[in-house]
Each structure stands twice: as C-alpha cells, then as structure tokens.
C-alpha cells in the first residue's frame, strides 16, 4: 500500500491550519481510498499521477468543515469524468445531511451510487486484504482516527513443481501449501516449504490527523509497521498560530516515549 500525503501547511494569512489529507493506493487492486477531502482535492489529483475514477472509499475524520470542504466538488468531478461505480463514504452522521443539502440546492445529480456509513468505534471495513478500524479521538466523538490493518498473505502454491514431480491433484496440494511434510511410497521426501512462496506478514498503518497530543494517539501508533509521513512543525511556530490543534515535534517525541514504555 502506498500512502500519499496532500500538502497541509500553516496558513499565516488566515492564522489557521489546513486539515491533513491522505490518499491510500492499494497494492493488489487499482482502488484509491481517500482520508479527508480538503478544498481543491480534484485539482491535486489532476496534478498527480492518481486517477479520480479509482476512488472507491472516502473517510472523513471530523465534523469540522475543513475535513470535508472539497467533498461536493470532488463528487461532481467524478460525475463529469463518467464514473459509474459506487463510492462509499464514511463519516459523522451530520455529513450525510450536509451532502444532501449540497446536492439539493446545487441541483446536482451524481452518475454513481453513494453509500454513506456513519463512523463509530470499531471495525469499519473488512475485506480480503485490508481492515479499517475507527477510533474516537475526542470525548464528544466529533473527531476520529483511522488505522489500516493489512492481513497476512499466504504463500502461492507452486503448481508447476507439483506437476513435475507427478503429484496427483487432490487434498495433498492443500497440505503441502500448509507447509506439511510427506514421505511418498517410493521413499521421496516432500518438504512442504518447497512448494509455496514465503508468507507475507501483515502490518499496521495509522493515519495521523492534525491534533494535540493525547494517549489515544500513542495507542494508534503502537506497533505500527511504519509511520505515515506527515508535516510536523516546531513547537514555538505551532503555538504562535494555533495553540493545541497541530502536530509538533514535541508531540512526536511524546508518542515515541509512550510506545517505548508500552513495549
């Protein structure tokens, strides 16, 4: 899986911080999952090598307008591009009413179906390869974080080798794929590990959001396979613009210290 960070900078003109926006490009399929939808997201796609038509899921992490400011425009752009496949949107309950109002007053009809799913603590998406878990990041449940779990992939059975050794097709193929060993009637030793490729271990990817340090942030990053690159700012610069709503180098240090204690 490839995670692409869309630019998020301190806006010194308006004294605010834009929300964090990521696109996740899946390995085995051509799908793109979008985490938050800032303004002009469709223009960012046009400047990159990503394709709008490959977006299948959109995750919105908060009720604030900045997390979904570009969502109506993005959906309209998908319609103009001729998209017909269903798009699933995961977000707070108020987001559904917001989208319905946007389509009503702008008299916009989408060329594809939109499935809305209200986010809550627990498992949001469960597929063959990936699982997405939602965690509330505030006590009032107005802000959420997402963790992607990539499942362990079993090795591929080497059918060509089995045919070469004249092994008849049947339940023994499954046993060999399961790394079991056998001794054939003619005395030939069949080593299960030789008949399948290595198992690919799963991993954990936590999608960070712009937020002040908290214990739940540390738990999200605990045992993560790797940290998603995000823009961090010096503590003094951050507090100058927004006191408690930005990721700083101090916060990163606190998260790493917590993880060391847990381990």
Swiss-Prot record:
Keyword Kinase attributed: no
Cellular compartments annotated: Plastid, Chloroplast
UniProt keyword list: Chloroplast, Plastid
SUPFAM superfamilies: Metallo-hydrolase/oxidoreductase
Listed InterPro entries: RibonucZ/Hydroxyglut_hydro
A GO cellular component annotation in the UniProt record: chloroplast
GO molecular function: 3'-tRNA processing endoribonuclease activity
Superkingdom: Eukaryota
Predominant subcellular localization, coarse grouping: plastid
UniProt record similarity statement: Belongs to the AtsA family.
Name listed for the protein in its UniProt record: Uncharacterized protein ycf56
Originating organism: Porphyra purpurea
